[in-house]
């Protein structure tokens, strides 16, 4: 999985040589096309609702844009990311053209997670409007 630009050609070649799919996070349809042209196997289409570094386009808008933009790349899978927690949200993403979803924050609340109990409680009690985007950690916007 690559999060910073197009993976180097040698990495893509190694993945293919060993049967390991290569994925990349994308926040715009233009980035998705560049990744597909480079030979990436899986596009993690990360909307503004996604945790961590995310783009400016919402998941609901971005997924169908990317699905249409890369439709000619038959071997590229699309995973929707950003604000997906329930089966209904997963079904909606798939109805918009995703082949599946990439979830993140929801796993912090599982029994298996090493997240502290206090943080788990806060995550589960939080409302959907209680996340923020900030540059405080890396200088680039990140959902926290």
Residue ranges and their predicted role:
Residues 1-74:
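Active-site entrance/lid segments in N-terminal catalytic domains of soluble metabolic enzymes
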Residues 25, 82-83:
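Conserved acidic functional residues
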């Amino acid at each position: 999985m690559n999060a910073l630009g197009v993976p180097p050609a040698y990495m893509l070649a190694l993945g293919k040589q060993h049967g390991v799919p290569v994925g990349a996070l994308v926040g715009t349809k233009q980035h998705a096309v560049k990744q597909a042209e480079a030979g990436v196997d899986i596009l993690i289409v990360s909307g503004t609702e996604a945790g961590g570094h995310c783009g400016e386009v919402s998941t609901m808008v971005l997924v169908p844009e990317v699905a249409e933009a890369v439709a000619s790349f038959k071997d590229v899978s699309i995973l929707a990311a950003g604000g997906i927690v329930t089966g209904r949200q997963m079904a909606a993403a798939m109805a918009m053209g995703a082949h599946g979803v990439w979830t993140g924050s929801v796993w912090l609340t599982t029994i298996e997670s090493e997240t502290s109990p206090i943080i788990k409680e806060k995550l589960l009690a939080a409302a959907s409007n209680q996340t923020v985007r900030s540059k405080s950690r890396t200088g680039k916007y990140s959902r926290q």
